[in-house]
Amino acid sequence: MDAIKKKMQAMKLEKDDAMDRADTLEQQNKEANIRAEKAEEEVHNLQKRMQQLENDLDQVQESLLKANTQLEEKDKALSNAEGEVAALNRRIQLLEEDLERSEERLNTATTKLAEASQAADESERMRKVLENRSLSDEERMDALENQLKEARFLAEEADRKYDEVARKLAMVEADLERAEERAETGESKIVELEEELRVVGNNLKSLEVSEEKANQREEAYKEQIKTLTNKLKAAEARAEFAERSVQKLQKEVDRLEDELVNEKEKYKSTTDELDQAFSELSGY
């Protein structure tokens, strides 16, 4: 009996120990599953990263291929450009040599042209000298006499225009004086009419003592005032017209003075030409 109890206790202890080991193994299994999940996640992430790296590698290789292709094209273009530069340098050298030869020929031709031009100028000068010497003194005198006649005609024409301008200026000045006199007369008449009007006004005031006579004479004085007023307006109109006439005459005087100055300048120029012609005649 005791042996059975001991065996049962021993079995219970083994059971408890087995339960503990089972719990421990279950916990270890859970932890192993967690580590396995983490490992799978890391593997998945690594696979994604490897795929990205492979894609990046493909792009880099493609870019490298394009870069190599462009580099080869640029190398070819550079080689072609270097060949063209060498050809252009050879052509420039040939052109420079041709230019030097052309400049030498041009200098030679320029020298010959200058000598020929000098000889031609000398021949032309000698021809003109001979032609000038071949002119007779009589022909030269005829030409000078014609110039003298023309100068005298111009001088006479200038004198005539000067006299005409002076006459017009005198007439304008006379008209201006008469206009000024008429204007002064008009102003005096206006003063007289104003004084007469003032006297009439005073008379009207003094004649107001008699109402009946004043009424009878009022109409007469009104008519007289109206007449005087009309005369005053007419005098003012004549004065304004005279003033406008004076302004117009002043403008005409200014214009004639300008014309007189121009004619004097023309007369002086003609006189100078005439004096020069006389001097040339005196020299012969």
Curated annotation (Swiss-Prot):
Tissue expr: Expressed in muscle (at protein level). Expressed in pincer muscles.
Modified sites of kind N-acetylmethionine: 1
Region named Disordered: 1-21
Keyword Coiled coil (UniProt): yes
InterPro entries: Tropomyosin (IPR000533)
Gene Ontology molecular function: protein homodimerization activity
Coiled coil feature spans: 1-280
Transmembrane segments: none
Superkingdom per UniProt: Eukaryota
PANTHER family: TROPOMYOSIN (PTHR19269)
Family named by the database record: Belongs to the tropomyosin family.
Name of the protein described by the UniProt record: Tropomyosin Por p 1.0101
Organism: Portunus pelagicus
